[in-house]
Amino acid sequence: MGFCRKFSSSVDARQMFGEMTKRSLYQWNTLLKSLSREKQWEEVLYHFSHMFRDEEKPDNFTLPVALKACGELREVNYGEMIHGFVKKDVTLGSDLYVGSSLIYMYIKCGRMIEALRMFDELEKPDIVTWSSMVSGFEKNGSPYQAVEFFRRMVMASDVTPDRVTLITLVSACTKLSNSRLGRCVHGFVIRRGFSNDLSLVNSLLNCYAKSRAFKEAVNLFKMIAEKDVISWSTVIACYVQNGAAAEALLVFNDMMDDGTEPNVATVLCVLQACAAAHDLEQGRKTHELAIRKGLETEVKVSTALVDMYMKCFSPEEAYAVFSRIPRKDVVSWVALISGFTLNGMAHRSIEEFSIMLLENNTRPDAILMVKVLGSCSELGFLEQAKCFHSYVIKYGFDSNPFIGASLVELYSRCGSLGNASKVFNGIALKDTVVWTSLITGYGIHGKGTKALETFNHMVKSSEVKPNEVTFLSILSACSHAGLIHEGLRIFKLMVNDYRLAPNLEHYAVLVDLLGRVGDLDTAIEITKRMPFSPTPQILGTLLGACRIHQNGEMAETVAKKLFELESNHAGYYMLMSNVYGVKGEWENVEKLRNSVKQRGIKKGLAESLIEIRRKVHRFVADDELHPEKEPVYGLLKELDLHMKEDLENCVYFEYEGDSL
């Protein structure tokens, strides 16, 4: 009767099917295939069940359709029931099509053990079945098993991997972040003659990019004759991920010159590059491009624009984009709130968080709470900290170790080490971040001994190992407390026992540690021996130490190098001016001041905030508009006199140098 050809839709087919008094197996199969084409999986299983009630036995055409429906609906129990039916029939049990469909069903339901068992029962699995198994392991979070199964496939004499199998294999290598394995697969691809398959080559490019094989990715990209938008976007992302944002923007310009139209992924990568390079001009051009292509309304693009403008220090433009987002998600709020804090506007971060809760009914996630607690830390208001702590407990975030660490840091910044310690003790699973937060808190308040006790307790009484950040915190704590011998011991411990390579920040703290006690010669020697060129931060620390210990000759040497690296930093000129002033070299003081004026260098406006009785008071240097300026300046003069008296009574101590 031409049942299959007569009806183009499953609705017509079902209507006609329902009017039949007697149905053949062919008609049942036709109906199920029609429903499958339209992805009406529930209907497939519903009619499959009715087929049994009509005592119509399914065949090797019926069962694969039903098993596909089970896989799509993750109905593993139903699928196992069908598997039981198949086992009772020798003909169906040996059918490759039915066996492959059972494997597909188990893979879709995440049951790889059953899928593997079923695969091993097949007499001669074809390339599709082999590829399904490789894909199944890769998609179910077992990339290593996917690679091992591919090895088994290659060893089989009766099957040859195709491009689909290889793309899946490359995806597994990408998830493993194994560039060495990626290179092996790349060689296999070339030997098998797939080197001109653009989809496969793009997958390899993505593998190299995400495995930090930067040179291999760039070289492969250059070898692609006909690059598409995926090729360009992948290599742009690779440059960004490897800290080469400026180069990423140059590649994007090459892409535009090549005539390749960017897509959403390209725009997102370029915006990340603009943010990392702080390239506001290119960011604005990319924004215009997004508007022309109608992409600005997509929440991912809008959020990336907010992030870019914030990191390019243009919060006004960031907020303008944010206000136009029709449906703001929690990621958008994270970009806005963290962006305001980055731009020194932590108070705006708190305000926007309140607006989010009251007006937008958006519930924050753990990431947003960490950002908000960070904003609160910048302000250092204790009462506000307690309010946020209550919010954290109310919404069940207190068990999150990252939020716990943020609370420890928050209370420390607010001067409440007691509350910081209570939060720390209440965290059941303390990781490195939590331990480091408490050590940092003690260090901020000059409690170096307590910081050392906490560090030693961490090392001896827990399974948590200190990382680079932990060592930076404990070194800073030792520096602030003048614990020179302990600081040097910690530095050696990091290098010799934990085999951690010090970075520039570690060396900066080490120089500060030596500079505070006047061991300037050793500090200079450290800057010469370290595997990095001295940064302005390190040289500025040295210059400050030279001023404190009145070493004018060394100060001039350091300042010369410092001004070459950063010639527009007002603070460094002030330091050198103070050195000359102490020596009575007023001509040099005048020369420096004239140089600052000629360069148009201005010192940033100093500002202080203090919270008293839940009210925030803001003080600005040389402020003549404060309503209580007279008592404020009177108190400052009185404090200044007390500080001078204390300074005169200070006891200085000598330090006997320790070798590194």
UniProtKB/Swiss-Prot annotation:
Gene3D superfamilies the record matches: Tetratricopeptide repeat domain
Residue spans of the PPR repeats: 24-58, 59-89, 95-125, 126-161, 162-196, 197-227, 228-262, 263-297, 298-328, 329-364, 365-399, 400-430, 431-466, 467-497, 503-533
Keyword Repeat: yes
GO MF annotation terms: RNA binding
Keyword check for Repeat: yes
Biological process, per Gene Ontology: RNA modification
Keyword terms, alphabetized: Repeat
Region called Type E(+) motif, residue ranges: 614-644
InterPro entries: E_motif, Pentatricopeptide_rpt, PPR_At4g14850-like_plant, TPR-like_helical_dom_sf
SUPFAM superfamilies documented for this protein: TPR-like
Region span, Type E motif: 538-613
UniProt family annotation: Belongs to the PPR family. PCMP-E subfamily.
Record protein name field: Putative pentatricopeptide repeat-containing protein At3g01580
